[in-house]
Regions:
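Conserved beta-strand positions
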Residues: 23-27, 136, 145, 191, ...
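C-terminal beta-strand-rich structural cap/linker in extracellular carbohydrate-active enzymes
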Residues: 389-408
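Active-site-proximal substrate-binding groove within the catalytic cores of carbohydrate-active enzymes
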Residues: 165-374, 378, 383
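Active-site groove signature of glycoside hydrolases
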Residues: 118-152
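Active-site-adjacent "subsite" loops/lids of carbohydrate-active enzymes
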Residues: 47-129
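Carbohydrate-recognition beta-sandwich/jelly-roll modules
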Residues: 1-68, 133, 286, 296-307, ...
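The substrate-binding groove and active-site-proximal loops of carbohydrate-active enzymes
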Residues: 24-43, 99-119, 155-169, 270
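Short, acidic/polar
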Residues: 7-16, 114-127, 279
């Protein structure tokens, strides 16, 4: 099942033109230490890094921050550690203690003192460094039992319990959003929350980054065959039901780096068995659901986005998902629900993404609405440019076809 936020706001403009790394940079690690919003901690080469990461200032650049994690080098931490900390674990427990840039302790947004401190620092930092776009990592709610700031409770037998800091996390997210919009009315905020779409938090951002929950599965199987299902993907990774686009981080090479190092060299050389097919299966799901892939860890989508650009697909182009009964492009006959035909309205016709998520090749007959495409539209393979002789299309197992339809 999926959550539905109502009312839904429109998706941000130009989101189909987002090209991570070339038209937008969603991730800019700008600090010497982790998540302390203070210009004094900018890296020594910050001006040069900012120029490079933003293509000389020509594309939006999202400065990296976080939620519940922050460096113990935060100037206010030594004095307020006991009040600000999430407990358990004990206050002062560090993650990655030997890596200065990424070492952190656990901070609780349930602490009003911490929220006020963070917001004051963030307001000043955004203004001083002109941060028009922000990226927040580690920003879902946590359970906390720290009574020093009001979390936790004790039952009649004296047993202590944690409480979820949802309201404090919402308050911090809301106030950051308001202050950011006050300074930069047309700026954007991205939150990276994999598979925890908390409406109280994601209501205060413009896009979601997801996909980090499947590292071991993908590393073991070298594919998303056992992860993706049409209904699961539709409910989890489209973002439309939350009023914001979702960007999926593929885990191929990242999984190999962290858990299966013996596979990394072959992956980078493109020599893993079935590697190209596994990549196309992943990309097919992205395209068939009108969502976004983070082009990293072995995945490139540039070729397919160029095809969409050449077809004239923009933010204003209608999208017809395979699940929508009013789509002008349907599959004829009774087929597996793992065979999907989605369509984007394009110049003088449509671009169809025909996805076959089964283990067998599929011969699919497309049923086209004559009121939209006329009685004898021209069909071609958008990747090869070859003309099709009719509306019957063969799709390899665990693969997709991009079919261009021209109205006649």
């Amino acid at each position: 099942f999926g959550l539905q936020i109502t009312p839904m706001r429109p998706l941000v403009r130009n989101r189909r033109l987002w090209r991570p790394w070339s038209a937008v940079n969603l991730w800019f690690p700008w600090e010497k230490i982790h998540n302390v919003p203070d210009a004094r901690f900018a890296k020594d080469n910050y001006p040069a890094m900012r120029k490079s990461f933003s293509s000389d200032g020509s594309i939006p650049l999202f400065h990296y921050f976080a939620g519940f994690s922050a460096s113990p080098e935060n100037p206010g931490y030594p004095q307020h550690a006991n009040e600000w900390s999430i407990t358990p674990p004990p206050a002062g427990t560090e993650v990655s203690p030997n890596d200065r840039e990424w070492r952190y302790v656990f901070m609780c947004a349930g602490s009003r003192s911490y929220r006020d401190y963070y917001l004051r620092s963030m307001s000043r930092c955004m203004r001083e460094l002109k941060m028009q776009e922000l990226y927040f990592d580690n920003c879902w709610s946590w359970f906390c039992g720290n009574e020093a700031h009001g979390c936790g409770w004790t039952d009649e037998h004296g047993k202590k319990y944690c409480t979820a800091n949802i309201l404090g996390s919402r308050e911090l997210a809301k106030n950051i959003y308001r202050e950011h919009r006050r300074q930069y009315p047309y700026g954007l905020i991205v939150r990276h929350i994999s598979q925890i779409p908390e409406p109280p938090l994601i209501s205060f951002c413009d896009a979601l980054v997801d996909g980090e929950c499947f590292m071991l599965d993908v590393g073991r199987d070298e594919s998303y065959y056992n992860v993706f299902r049409p209904d699961f993907f539709r409910a989890s990774f489209r973002g439309e039901q939350f009023g914001m686009p979702s960007v999926f981080i593929p885990q191929f090479e990242r999984a190999y780096q962290l858990h299966f190092p013996e596979k990394l060299k072959d992956s980078k050389a493109g020599k893993l068995p079935g590697q190209e097919k596994h990549m196309r299966h992943f990309i097919g799901y992205i395209l068939a659901h009108d969502t976004h892939a983070w082009p990293n860890f072995g995945v490139s989508v540039s070729k397919y986005l160029k095809i969409m650009d050449n077809a004239g697909i923009t933010d204003d182009s209608a999208f017809y998902g395979y699940w929508q009964p009013d789509s002008p492009v349907r599959t004829a006959g009774t087929l597996s629900d793992r065979i999907m035909a989605s369509a984007y309205a394009a110049d003088n016709g449509a671009l169809v993404i025909l996805m076959n998520d089964t283990d067998q090749p599929a011969d699919v007959l497309l049923s086209l609405d004559s009121k939209v495409f006329g009685n004898s539209p021209a069909l071609s393979d958008a990747e090869s440019g070859k003309t099709l002789s009719g509306t019957a299309v063969s799709v390899p197992a665990r693969d997709f076809r991009m079919i261009r339809i021209i109205k006649k």
